[in-house]
Amino acid sequence: MNKKQLEEIIKDSVVFTIHTKNGFVSEELNRDKINFRKENMLEIVKRHGVYQYISLDDIDVITIMR
């Protein structure tokens, strides 16, 4: 998956979760909680200023909640 594909998938969603190939499932996210870093890295802003980084290549499923 690349940045453009991910943006297209989530553009109309309000809340979504990201599932990776190694079994990680994110908390419920919205577009304000993610940033793109470098060409192939997704930054998830979590609580208390904690960040989590996911390679776009590791994304397996995106579940649109609403």
Model-derived regions: residue spans:
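Short glycine-rich, low-complexity segments
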Residues: 1-25
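Structured surface patches comprising rigid loops and adjacent beta-strands/short helices at the edges
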Residues: 32-34, 54-65
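Acidic, low-complexity, intrinsically disordered interaction modules
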Residues: 22-50
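Short acidic DE-rich linear segments
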Residues: 1-4, 62-66
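Short linear motifs in low-complexity, proline-biased tails and propeptides
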Residues: 17-19, 48-57
